[in-house]
Amino acid sequence: MAGTTSGDAGPIAAGTTVREAVSRYPGIEDVFERHGIQGCGGPQGPIEPIGFFARVHNVEPEALLRELNDYVRGRAGQALPATAAGAPQAEQSFYFLPIATAVFLALLAGLPLGIIAALGGAHDIGVASRWTQLVQAHGHLQVVAWVGLFILGIAYHVLPRFKGVPLWPERLVLPSFFLLLAGVVLRTVSQPWADAAGPAGLLAASAVLELAGALAFATVVAGTLGRARREAFDAFLLAAVGWLVAAAVANLVSVAEVVSAGTNFIPRDRDEPLLALQLYGFLSLFIFGVSLRVLPAFLSLQPTRTRLLAPVLVLFNAGLALRVVSQWGTAYGDWTPGAVLRAAPAYLLAAGVVAFALSLNVYLPSQRSEAADPERAYARLIRAAYVWLAFVAGLEVWLATRDLVGGDQASFLETSALRHALALGFITQMIFGVAYRALPVFAGKRLHSQRLVDVTFLLINVAAVTRVGPALIDAGTLGSRYDHLAGAGAVAWLAVAVFAVNIVRTVRARPPEAELITLVEIEEKEPSVEQEPFVVTPQTLVGDLLERVPGALELLVSRGFTPLADPEMRRAMAPRITLERACQIHPVDLEALLKDLNALAASK
């Protein structure tokens, strides 16, 4: 329990969440309702700290806390379930539905389709007449379902915690998921047979549904960010969802052309820019944004060089826009860009990657910190993912330079290797790394197995090397190269399966049983009124500060430490991070904050 403030001397403090209070003290929701705060009933009520929740709703926190504690005292001696910091109440959250769906579709259809397509490139297995369609169905399913839906689930859970505001407009949250899901499923089952009238109609419908889902998701992300304090990572997320909508529009146009022509595959000159919009525009930029927000804390990175972030956005978005426009110019007109124009997007994208890496300091060693996470097997996945991103940037430059000096343009296998280095090596590995760190926190559980994290790391990197190497190195027969690609798909399937087992075992683990504690015992555990003054220093742990200084939570949240408003994030980070490190991550003026915190501590 957090310490008390003036006006709340009792078991309920400003740091107690509404959910904790309502679940521990049945009937206490009436107190909230008297202050005009509706919808607080039941254990699924708001998880905001009461002090913060009151201020958001323009209610005087001390008056509310006084009434809440008066209510509790009227129930003295009754057994109450304590919500200890390490034992959050079990709850079912929406985030797990899109994440579970993404994993299910990847294992059931996305990766198996890729394996079948690779085998069909080397052997006569009866798919030759629909080989291109299978390749495109596999790629689209992996991008939109496996990665896209996974990101959607993570985003809807973390955005309110990052920003300290609820998702808005909330009514679009469920529709965005179901529209994207319906669209990608229809695309997968219809495209191989879309040269017939019935499947062609389903293919057209899939593109409309995906556009509607992309618009809904982009609206929620932009709406939520727009209602909160601006932070550096916001621009990356906004750019990402903007490119997502552009990709959905491009997909609709391409599908409409396919249906009107009576075919069932998108020509390569139209498919290449669509994939660039999805992989570089939406997925990579969204991961960049989340990386800015969480990796400094996850990996104890050096302070972010925020002055480089604007150049990153300019370089990366300019490179992507130039690539897409030049490729569309070739696809829809007689214009053929020269070697310089073909090479420029690669150089711009690579420069953006370099600038981002320099800004994030992701290739530098972690800072030494006594508050560092002791279990960081996931860190290898994240570090390796950024090694793969550097490889992608280097490969972009190499292929562009070879073309620029008069060599061959990139072949189908080479561009395929480039995409899979990005999709498997960087994007999928980042999903594994961040999810292994975040999902157990979301569920309030400990990760089932650190050893399975190591197995996942090994499998995904073997899969990426096996998928990229044979496509780049012209050795052996074409059939043997495709056999290697099929093997890579099988190893990638195993990586996702191991990841799924580890996460499912984590989420389904039995939560610690709630402790029963009486009001008398609570009061005995409360700190004495007579205490030595608490001095706040740069090395003070945030968890100690919240426990020892009443009102510190509200002050920190008001200064931009909005993740502390969420109990899950507080439990995960506060006991391990110092004020100095927290101010480096956000950033906040440490000296001014220390002055205000010490003044607050002295006043209590």
Protein language model regions, located:
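Hydrophobic alpha-helical transmembrane segments of multi-pass integral membrane proteins
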Residues: R75-V529
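Compact, charge-rich alpha-helical regulatory domains located at protein termini
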Residues: G3-L64, P527-K604
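Long amphipathic N-terminal alpha/beta scaffold segment
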Residues: V72-P81, A599-K604
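Short hydrophobic interaction/assembly module
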Residues: P61-L65, N69, R73
